[in-house]
From Swiss-Prot:
It comes from Mus musculus (Mouse). InterPro entries: NUT, NUT_N. Residues 187-207, 489-535, 691-733 are annotated as: Disordered. Residues 715-733 have a biased composition (Basic residues). Coiled coil: none annotated. This is NUT family member 2. Pfam families: NUT.
Length: 733
């Protein structure tokens, strides 16, 4: 028979004590002799059997023991130290040996049993046998050979920090010999309530998984299983819908599959569960949907609780971190002990720690000195302030009282302009659009751009704005009355006008002469031969190719005047310089719009005299038509910088700037468009131009827009009137 199923496994000797206050003598054990003798003790008559312990009484804590629950407790008859009781008043007929067996774990030596007092009582033998989960009360009897020991030793085991202490139950007034602490590798958890006090044969109740899941407290276990299974489903079956309800369905399914085939892997179990789920009706699924809803509520509540605990912990950690570390208490120094203030502080530290955060700053005030600003920093600050005071008003924003009185209006407007964040963001958005930038470049004042991009240390933007605004408010006649300094330095004679041509003021050609007078020093006399004129025209074409893109497409616009067919020369100027590409000229003051305004009245007079109105000019579809017709006739390769719209043929892709700037009328915008057509018309090569002799009054300066338009047409339509040509073009389209 296996000894581990019969006795407790103890690594050290056992001392057993039972109560018998009426006994006069004790039986002692002498471990030194092989067969020791003991003092005889009369055996008392049997005492009345006590009432068994009721189930509502608190039982003593028990631990798991290595005793089989189905077998009675039988003392082994192995050789050991016998306990002999000799006859007394009751006079037993024979001495019955009682062996106390000491057992230990394998591999450890057996230690001798020390002297122990044993008292026998007339109570039934009771032994509490714990199980794996619950503990039941077992009733066992001794063999028939030991009839005189018809009592049961009520022993209890009290766990104290991982040790066992064997003591008597119920307690006695005699001195009790306790067991030496013994460490056990088995579970010492306290069993659940309701597992004690049951009478009858030895019965051990174990909580199987079925019983655990059938109890109300198994909801928590199912909730944890549901969370784990839901994670597995999301990992292995991501395409599954209703993961929560399907996970609830898998709880019993996976349990059944695990019982039938424990070696089945998780993926196979999930696939089989999915097949069963697909075969389940919607009515049968309702219970799992309800369960999943409850579990989802539990999970959300748990997450909220966890977040709340994290917040509380973080707050506690911050509070602990902000509290200054307390210095360890020190013995008061003799010189400090005489001061009453320091003594009171010491007492407060020892009695009430809550006042420590309030007294801590007082110490700092006494020990630390206030921080002083270094003189170097003060000096540097003063230098920076002096340097800022030397900036003009536009940078620092600070103005003197006189300037504030004089320029109160413009300053307030500028401040509002720079302080409006929405306006600045809108301007940035517009500047990011290419079409808008091209439109602005067509009307922006080049003088303003030149001043902004210049390297001058001080720029008075307000004064420049005033000058430009004043210039724009002037009429064409007032602008034409302004003197040109180039005319004063160098004499420019105006040729007699053609009698058949309309009269144009002499100052109309002033801008062109003013710009070209500083570059060319050689004049050309009127009436040159046709050969000389043609050679010079060819030289002009060659020089047009050498003109840089900055001169052609820079911020300096051009002004080309249209002419009549009957009068090829509208403006006769004795000084004719080399045209700067497409008949353009350099222009420093004013803007393109301003220059177009100056010749507005003259162009309108020409249109009236030629019976051409601005509405007739707008009959053309777009600038793309002119670009396409002119560039097909160009024999030489035009640089890409010359015209950025070379590859464009759609009218919508080419910007048509017509801004409304301070009361600009639509007529003036149309004039600016006609001016732009004249610019593109100047690209007609010289080979296609008719070589008119001096008798026809050919001007060797820039060609007019009407001349360019006629030159671009075939020679057979050379002498057709303009109105007829336009009507034919309309019929063609």
């Amino acid at each position: 028979m296996d000894l581990s199923r019969q006795t407790w496994l103890l690594s050290k000797p056992i001392g057993i004590v039972s109560e018998a206050s009426s006994l006069g003598q004790n039986m002692t054990i002498n471990p030194g002799a092989s067969l020791p003798t003991f003092a005889t003790l009369p055996v008392l008559p049997p005492a009345p059997q006590p009432v068994p312990q009721l189930f509502w009484e608190p039982p003593a804590p028990l631990v798991t023991a290595g005793i089989s629950p189905g077998n009675p407790l039988v003392l082994s008859a192995l050789p050991g130290m016998p306990l002999v009781a000799e006859g007394g008043s009751t006079a037993l007929s024979a001495a019955v040996p009682l062996n106390i067996v000491q057992l230990g774990t394998l591999g450890q030596p057996v230690q001798p049993v020390h002297n122990t007092n044993i008292v026998l009582t007339q109570v039934p033998l009771t032994c509490n046998i714990p199980g794996t989960q619950g503990v039941g009360m077992g009733f066992m009897t001794t063999p028939a050979a030991n009839n005189f020991i018809n009592t049961r030793i009520a022993s209890t085991v009290q766990p104290q920090e991982g040790t066992w202490i064997l003591g008597p139950h119920p307690p006695t007034t005699q001195q009790v010999v306790q067991l030496v602490p013994v460490k056990s590798p088995v579970n010492s958890a306290q069993p659940p309530k309701g597992a004690y006090g049951e009478s009858g044969p030895a019965n051990i109740q174990t909580n199987s998984p079925e019983n655990y899941l059938s109890k109300p407290d198994s909801v928590y276990g199912n909730f944890r299983r549901w969370q784990h299974i839901k994670t597995l489903v999301q990992r292995h079956l991501p395409q599954t819908t209703d993961v929560a309800a399907f996970s609830c369905f898998l709880i019993p399914v996976l349990r059944s599959l695990a019982r039938r085939k424990p070696t089945m892997n998780v993926e196979e179990g999930l696939w089989r569960g999915l097949q069963e789920w697909q075969c389940t009706s919607n009515y049968d699924r309702m219970i799992f949907y309800e369960m999943a809803e409850k579990f989802t509520e539990f999970e959300s509540a748990e997450e909220m609780e966890n977040s709340r605990l994290e917040i509380i912990r973080s707050i506690q950690y911050q509070v602990v971190a902000t509290i200054p570390r307390q210095d360890p208490p020190r013995l008061p120094a003799p010189e400090v002990a005489e001061e009453p203030e320091c003594t009171s502080m010491k007492t407060v530290h020892q009695t009430d720690p809550a006042h420590l955060p309030e007294l801590r700053p007082q110490k700092l005030q006494k020990t630390e000195t206030p921080m002083e600003i270094p003189p170097e920093a003060v000096r540097e600050y003063m230098e920076i302030m002096d340097w800022l005071e030397g900036f003009p008003q536009s940078f620092t924003g600070e103005a003197k009282e006189k300037e504030e009185d004089e320029n109160n209006g413009p300053e307030q407007e500028g401040d509002d302009l720079y302080s409006d964040a929405e306006l600045l963001s809108y301007i940035d958005e517009l500047c990011s659009q290419k079409h808008f930038v091209e439109q602005v470049e067509a009307i922006i004042n080049p003088q303003f751009v030149a001043e902004i991009l210049s390297t001058k240390p001080e720029i008075d933007i307000l004064a420049l704005t005033k000058v430009l605004e004043h210039e724009e408010e002037l009429t064409v006649d007032q602008l034409l009355e302004k003197p040109c300094p180039a005319l004063k330095k160098r004499g420019v004679e105006r040729a007699p006008p053609n009698p058949g041509a309309p009269q144009i003021p002499a100052s109309t050609s002033v801008p062109s002469v003013c710009q070209d007078a500083e570059r060319d020093e050689h004049g050309v006399q009127r009436g040159a031969s046709a050969q000389t004129g043609s050679s010079r025209m060819a030289s002009l074409d060659q020089q047009c190719l050498e003109v840089t893109s900055a001169e052609i497409w820079g911020p300096k616009p051009a002004t080309v005047f249209p002419s009549n067919q009957s009068s090829p020369s509208l403006v006769d100027v004795r000084y004719t310089g080399i045209p700067r590409g497409r008949g353009t000229y350099n222009q420093s003051p004013g803007s393109r719009c301003v220059r177009s305004f100056r010749v507005a009245s003259a162009i309108e007079d020409l249109h009236r005299s030629l019976a051409r109105t601005i509405e007739d000019k707008e009959e053309l579809h777009s600038l793309s038509f002119l670009l396409a017709s002119q560039y097909r006739l160009v024999p030489w390769k035009v640089p890409h910088q010359v015209c950025p719209y070379t590859d464009l043929s759609d009218s919508e892709s080419i910007p048509s700037p017509c801004p409304k700037l301070r009361g600009l009328s639509p007529d003036l915008c149309s004039i600016a468009k006609s001016k732009k057509r004249a610019l593109f018309g100047s690209l007609v090569p010289m080979a296609k131009r008719p070589n008119l002799g001096p008798g026809h009054g050919v001007s060797e300066g820039p060609l007019s827009a009407l001349e360019l338009a006629h030159l671009s047409q075939p020679q057979k339509r050379k002498h057709e009137p303009l109105g007829t040509h336009k009507r034919k073009r309309k019929k063609r389209h």
